[in-house]
Amino acid sequence: MTIESSAKNILFLHRFAVLFVLLFCVLLIPPYFEGSLLMERVWHVLFTFVLLWALYTVAGSRKVLLLAALMLIPTISSTWLAGPEQARYLAYIDNATNILYFGLICFFLASYIFTTKRVTQEVIFAAMCFYILLAVLWAAIYTNLELFYGNAFLFQGELAAAAGIEADDLFQHMIYYSFVTLSTLGYGDVIPDHLAAQNWAAMEAMIGQFYIAIVMARLVSIYTVEKEEEASLATPPD
């Protein structure tokens, strides 16, 4: 086995861990450089890496890989074309492609988690990536709702002055709101005002509860069974 092939195997075996790190970079780095044109480009580069690496994570399934590859080109294109100085319809397209692409990735992650027989480090990272991507997917939905209706959400305090000016800034605010809703924290600084926004927010809150009740419960049950089997094998026969 060559060094190159060995490195590829290591990357593939830790593909969900790498995706998790990239997602955290996309979420946590941009707010510290708000308003910077350079940071806007850096964010687009990081987000493109997330899109590309998300494709790499589904390489184990040919059908999903083919669909994701077909969707990747319009998703990356819309990411770079949509901007504060561009037409609003490009922001709609950008969010729509993100919804479809991340929806497919979430489908693969859910299938991977529910078909696994052992709880490994990568399975845990896959579960965390699944959770984060659900929030990003819903953030794109919320952004399109606000762009379409104009007043789908009510913003309190300083957010009221900042939100809704540019599609990119709006998406960042909606990522925050999406995580707050998915985790059912509900700070109250962003309030869904339109019926469509309320329904989508309620759906996300329910999915957040289902995630804990179903996904996490399954992983815990598999892990418990593994430990019981290991204990039974380690116990010497009478």
What do the predicted segments below correspond to?
Residues 3-20, 60:
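N-terminal membrane topogenic signal
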Residues 12-27, 68-74:
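Alpha-helical transmembrane segments
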Residues 28-40, 54-62, 84-85:
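Short, hydrophobic transmembrane alpha-helix segments
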Residues 32-47, 91-103, 174-175:
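Structural signature of hydrophobic alpha-helical transmembrane segments
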Residues 33-35, 137-176:
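Outer-pore turret/helix-boundary of cation channels
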Residues 62-73, 91-98, 119-129:
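Cytoplasmic-side transmembrane-helix entry/capping segments in multi-pass membrane proteins
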Residues 106-151:
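Pore-domain transmembrane helices of cation channels
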Residues 168-230:
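Pore domain of cation channels
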